[in-house]
A protein has these predicted regions:
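Hydrophobic residues within well-ordered alpha-helices
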Residues: 38, 77-78, 165, 191-192
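Paired acidic/hydrophobic, glycine-rich loop segments that form the ligand-binding mouth/hinge
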Residues: 84-90, 197-201
Length: 202
């Protein structure tokens, strides 16, 4: 899970308060999450929302804008008024947009400006407790026995989880089927429900 400390939250509220010189306290502040509710990025945004409302005395909303591996939400923020009232809460997804989209809706290097690092998180591979896999070696063995039969969920094509699993499968010489989702919440639900074997994410 993401590592968040009280000091981090205090610094974040200070950064949001002073970074945008044109911020208008009377207006609603919006934190755009480029994934559906229920995932780790959404959970982090809601922690940040509560803290910012308390510290800044402003109304702060979380808006989930999922799709296209996070690029739709990123594009919405890029096109918003530069008044310091709209922010993107994301992880690595925006960085791969130029590589996975032929005609991206934004230039991530020019249209977005980093404000603050709120947290960090490890990437893990997890499975339903009822599945026979106890180690990644078990996953590799099952994939070798029946190529393509093992499925893993990620939060979208081209995201870090997808790329990492693709590299791991290539190094192991196996075929593992990728099942992309719009976000970590729906992906985790299907893994817990036994519809997909594995999930890779934070």
């Amino acid at each position: 899970m993401k590592k968040i400390t009280r000091r981090t939250m205090l610094a974040a509220s200070a950064a949001f308060a002073v970074a945008p010189a044109l911020a208008q306290p009377a207006k609603v502040m919006t934190l755009v999450v480029p994934f559906p509710p229920g995932g780790s990025t959404d959970a982090l945004a809601r922690l940040l929302q509560a803290h910012l409302q308390t510290k800044l005395g402003r109304t702060v909303l979380v808006e989930n804008k999922s799709g296209a591996a996070g690029s739709l939400g990123a594009a919405q923020v890029a096109k918003s008024a530069p008044d310091g009232n709209t922010y993107l809460v994301t992880f690595d997804s925006h960085a791969v947009i130029p590589a996975i989209l032929e005609k991206p809706q934004l230039d991530v290097e020019k249209d977005l400006v980093p404000v603050f690092l709120v947290g960090t998180a490890p990437y893990v591979i997890a499975t339903n407790a009822n599945r026979p896999f106890k180690t990644f070696a078990d996953v590799i063995a099952a994939s070798k026995a029946k190529p393509g039969s093992i499925q893993y969920a990620s939060v979208g094509i081209g995201t870090l989880g997808h790329l990492a699993m693709t590299m791991l499968a290539k190094q192991a010489g196996v075929e593992i089927t990728h099942v992309p989702y719009r976000g970590g919440g729906p992906a985790m639900n299907d893994v817990l429900g036994g519809h997909v074997d594995l999930i890779v994410g934070s």
